[in-house]
């Protein structure tokens, strides 16, 4: 159940501890942000999810009325989500009649050897599904994205008050430092994905994920897993992929231009034009300027490195002119450059920092000029690095604020 005191775990990440709320695990289940093609329960029985259930914001199980097929048997029941199997007993759910219809216990971490599964009040054993080995993305990346989505949804200038108090001479250095950490993190996440699925599949998954925007990232990853790059050539039926992928699409609040079916058609046009685009991306690295985040003014860096022309090259030679504008900028900075760096070891951090801002929360776009960091009246151009530095700072503040409520758990 979701409560104001939502359970929070603290885990060890790439560069230190991070917090993960149980609510995030519930979102993973709701959005299907895991490999649904190889679902198996702890007892070995296969699982098929027909419907994840309705997210319950009141008392009782986390999801009501899920439609499942367990070992060939169709079941309609509730789903409860926890970090550990033992949380069921710790929360005394077996004593609560509201949980008598729970048909599946979804946990993040695998149970210890010999650990007993959860049981309902009628003493019936509840099947258990472990999510961790099935996740599309690293836990730290998922927690970070969720925190930023939640924080930046608040239209409050007050959250930047501490930054506004930093002397102007120090503020730029602080945000550069935060941006550098964010760049290293993105490179590590890209490296993990390449190690897990290989270069071509990693590039394919990353491209579709970014085209999904924040509403349909998980659904796009599910599509990428089911339909590899080779399936997107001439004759690919986008309508069938959209309907039959098994992905959980979110269309409420999505602009028509960003509708997932429109983005799938966009990716098809991309692959038809450049079926070998992951290989082209690796070849392009030979011509890229490399280096760290030296304090070069963005305007000069863009001129020296020819970033405007490089933007055209990415659009034409890699994406086949199928993607442009700010979404192309996010493809370059969230996808292409981290992947290139992870695969080749050539640091594209300088390009990444000075690249065009791309899609960022509107609060970040307006805060940078207000703080005198970049934009109108600051003498510095808005760029991706400043935006990422700001996002990293926001996330760090939120992590510090929530850590006091976290419980110490082993790293994932």
Describe the function of each predicted region.
Residues 74, 91-98, 104:
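Compact, well-ordered interaction domains used in eukaryotic information-processing assemblies
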Residues 1-9:
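Intrinsically disordered, low-structural-confidence terminal and linker regions
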Residues 76-84, 105-107:
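Active-site ExK catalytic segment of metal-dependent nucleases
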Residues 175-411:
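Hydrophobic, aromatic-lined core segments that form the binding pocket/scaffold
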Residues 67-78:
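Active-site beta-strand-loop-beta-strand hairpin of nuclease catalytic cores
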Residues 8-48:
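Short Lys/Arg-enriched alpha/beta "domain-start" segment
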Residues 106-229:
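Internal, well-ordered alpha/beta segment that forms a basic, Gly-enriched binding/recognition surface
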